[in-house]
Amino acid sequence: MTQLAIGEATPHGATYDGHGVNFTLFSAHAERVELCVFDSRGNERRYDLPGRRGDVWHGYLAGARPGLRYGYRVHGPWQPAQGHRFNPAKLLLDPYARQVEGELKDHPLLHGGHDEPDYRDNAAVAPKSVVISDHYDWEDDAAPRTPWGKTVIYEAHVKGLTYLHPELPQEIRGTYKALGHPVMVAYFKQLGITALELLPVAQFASEPRLQRMGLTNYWGYNPMAMFALHPAWASSPETALDEFRDAVKALHRAGIEVILDIVLNHSAELDLDGPTFSLRGIDNRSYYWIRDDGDYHNWTGCGNTLNLSHPGVVEYACECLRYWMETCHVDGFRFDLASVMGRTPTFRQDAPLFAAIKACPVLSTVKLIAEPWDIGEGGYQVGNFPPPFAEWNDHFRDAARRFWLPRNLTTGEFACRFAASSDVFKRNGRAPGASVNLLTAHDGFTLRDCVCFNQKHNEANGEENRDGTNSNYSDNHGKEGLGGPLDLMERRRDSIHALLATLLLSQGTPMLLAGDEHGHSQHGNNNAYCQDNALTWLDWQQANRGLTTFTAALIRLRQQIPALTGNSWWEEGDGNVRWLNKNAQPLSADEWQNGPKLMQILLSDRFLIAINATLEVTDIVLPEGEWRAVPPFAGEDNPVITAVWQGLCVFQRG
């Protein structure tokens, strides 16, 4: 290998062209950048990057090939009060690294939040970037492009979903390979979901605090390398990318979309006591929101916040999204703590990153889902994201639970949430699909735990049960914990059925948490982010198959109702919806606000949802015509008057 040629400022990262590798690094405040390459024995050789175009440093290393391990040392001022923490003694990870060798350890040589620079070299313990080739044969792969009105999302963890599945080959359980295995594809099709939403698959690290307690970060919301697949779920780091793409291709062949949960709000460098391994040493001032005293704005609760209003960081974020789309053919993204994306530092719908996504012909055409809050002032932004974003609807989650469990919600409020929360999302030209309705998600109680626990039980997390929300709107039905007498178990079953039916028969885009369809419990832990064990792994052998069948029937029913699949707002007299009382008459103003929680919802003039959220069996009168109960609900073939137990029943006009 020779000295570096000047190379090109694009594409960003390390790019192999068949003859050598072009390297680039964004740093607006650096004074010098060294590329450091390592041989198989760990010997280091350094090269100055000779080119600079704007704020991008670049150079070309002829003869370099995939498999080369590298990093950067970045020279510049050490001025913590101004947000500058350059220290060439620290080897830094390429923010665009496609593969990483080594884990991020809790090691004093990696800590960079000191008042004075630590000049001890950290190359022996620092993770290294690895050059790869992106080539892959996609054959005839085509994106399913499921319309929002037909979309049913299934949120799952790569490992937890399949690690205990007895029908999968032992060696692929809990891996990317398992996602595309015929056993899993057949299950997804039988269930009826149209999109698999994966918790973060970009490489992440366990926080130093967890490492000291002997725990690990399981969920993955502590990003280390945003362009690299987490290697633990692959046969080897070298094969991770192809194994993931094989799974995407298999899922696409079955008509199932793949959505990635992506963390563009903070990095695993955490606060000033956290490790320095990349962005902090490359250009702290540009990559993060810095306070006047040089510390970080912590709008994420994770110690730092990415400055997604800076042009260089906006470009980084957009290239990250395009990489996953173009290299891995993913169909969309769910953005963690997405209000950070709109901070300038106040939240704006025309924030630079939003504008860049809207203007991008690639990014603006896929499914984009925001978790529409962060923990900073003004961070709660439900309903305020611009098109083409959809949003997690916590109004729906809380209302559904309050209606069926504590039973302290009006019929009017329930109906509003059932109708895709038009008061929140019917603006800026958005359709009902912008409301992503959920009962549960990875954070919080599972659905079974919602009906078994009144209090969280997070002691295993090592924080004396202080972590996790206390606002669960749950109901243990008279006994804390799993198990109980038959009548209690039946009441819990009825509540689960009512909640699932509400989720899957409401207007908007439903999201189902993996495991809720077969009764998975985390034993009351509502923040199992550090539990990589049987608490979070789905136990397929103990699955409630009756509940799975019930859920699948609901999804099939949903796809038959035009009022739900049309993805257009319901208007008075359009034939999509009528709201009736138990006597099949229009609900009065008093019944909306003060009446018993009894109602009938007529959809598309031929599907009737009879709802009884009281504790009494109630006679209801169905509208004129011949009606029959439809799967998964039992009932008479053509009743005119019927008794509805606590829960709901669906009828179809004959």
From Swiss-Prot:
Keywords: Carbohydrate metabolism, Glycogen metabolism, Glycosidase, Hydrolase. GO terms for molecular function: glycogen debranching enzyme activity; hydrolase activity, hydrolyzing O-glycosyl compounds. The keyword Flavoprotein does not apply. One of its GO terms (biological process) is glycogen catabolic process. It comes from the Bacteria. It catalyses: Hydrolysis of (1->6)-alpha-D-glucosidic linkages to branches with degrees of polymerization of three or four glucose residues in limit dextrin. The keyword Hydrolase applies. SMART domains: Aamy. Residues 459-484 are annotated as: Disordered. Pathway: Glycan degradation; glycogen degradation. The record marks 443 as: Transition state stabilizer. Its EC number is 3.2.1.196. The active site is at residues 336, 371. Belongs to the glycosyl hydrolase 13 family. PANTHER family: GLYCOGEN DEBRANCHING ENZYME (PTHR43002). Removes maltotriose and maltotetraose chains that are attached by 1,6-alpha-linkage to the limit dextrin main chain, generating a debranched limit dextrin. This is Glycogen debranching enzyme.
